[in-house]
Swiss-Prot record:
Monomer. HAMAP family: Cytc_PetJ. Binds 1 heme c group covalently per subunit. Belongs to the cytochrome c family. PetJ subfamily. NCBIfam families: Cytc6PetJCyano. Functions as an electron carrier between membrane-bound cytochrome b6-f and photosystem I in oxygenic photosynthesis. The gene is petJ. This is Cytochrome c6. Keywords: Chloroplast, Electron transport, Heme, Iron, Metal-binding, Photosynthesis, Plastid, Signal, Thylakoid, Transport. Its main location: plastid. It is found in: Plastid, Chloroplast thylakoid lumen. It comes from the Eukaryota.
C-alpha cells in the first residue's frame, strides 16, 4: 500500500511538472507570436474581442479546442498561425485559458 501511494504521489508530481513546462512554453509562444496584438489579454484590432474570460465565454472561445482552431486557421483580422506545431498551438491555448482564469 505504501509503495502504491508513493507511486501515485510521484506520478502527480511529474504530471504537474510537465503541465508547468507546457504553460511556460505557451507563454514563450504567446510572447513571440501573439503579444503584439493581445498583450495583457487585450485586442488592439478588435477591442471588444479580448482574451478576458468573459469575452472568451461570450464568443464560445473558452476551450483549448476553440482557441487552437482560431490560432491554426485564423479568422477575420487574425492571421493563421498554421506554421506553429500542434503542440505549440495547444500550449499557447492552455496558456491563454490559464491567464484568462487568473484575470490576466
Amino acid at each position: 500500500m505504501k509503495s502504491l501511494l508513493t507511486f501515485i504521489l510521484t506520478t502527480i508530481f511529474c504530471i504537474q511538472q510537465v503541465w508547468a513546462a507546457d504553460l511556460a512554453h505557451g507563454e514563450q509562444i504567446f510572447s513571440a507570436n501573439c503579444a503584439a496584438c493581445h498583450a495583457g489579454g487585450n485586442n488592439v484590432i478588435m477591442p471588444e474581442k479580448t482574451l478576458k474570460l468573459d469575452a472568451l465565454e461570450a464568443n464560445q472561445m473558452n476551450s483549448v479546442e476553440a482557441i487552437s482552431t482560431q490560432v491554426r486557421n485564423g479568422k477575420n483580422a487574425m492571421p493563421s498561425f498554421s506554421r506553429l506545431t500542434d503542440s505549440d498551438i495547444e500550449d499557447v491555448a492552455n496558456y491563454v485559458l490559464a491567464q484568462a482564469k487568473k484575470g490576466w
